[in-house]
């Protein structure tokens, strides 16, 4: 089950988000947890955490730990732009995250900047 925990993002990719748009979350992590709990009771065992950029959501690593407290949950993956991975990698491992998908738009700095609106390829690669 795909769970979008935020619409906010630190990038402004041409294919995803206009320059001025940065919508606040509409559901709390507690509310999202209740949805995940209900889904698990219907047989869902795998969750994919997405956004926007899920790593800018306060409390995301605790939320992942909490999802793993649901007995039937077997696998949690996160999709990220990679910018904050260095900052959160250890916490994500401790939370039990199964895997990480990184959206990498280009390995060329100028093209990366043009697509994402952010000069952050080095930060993403470090992550």
Residue ranges: model-predicted function:
Residues 1-76:
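Conserved alpha-helical substructure of the radical SAM core
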């Amino acid at each position: 089950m795909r769970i979008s925990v935020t619409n906010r993002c630190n990038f402004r990719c041409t294919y995803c988000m206009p320059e001025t748009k940065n919508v606040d979350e509409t559901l709390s992590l507690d509310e999202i947890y209740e949805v995940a709990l209900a889904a698990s009771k219907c047989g869902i065992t795998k969750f994919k955490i997405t956004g926007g950029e899920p790593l800018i959501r306060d409390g995301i690593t605790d939320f992942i730990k909490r999802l793993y407290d649901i007995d039937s949950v077997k696998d949690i993956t996160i999709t990220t732009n990679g910018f904050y991975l260095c900052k959160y990698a250890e916490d994500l491992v401790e939370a039990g995250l199964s895997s990480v998908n990184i959206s990498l738009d280009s390995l060329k700095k100028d093209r990366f900047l043009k697509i994402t609106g952010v000069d952050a390829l080095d930060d993403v690669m470090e992550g």
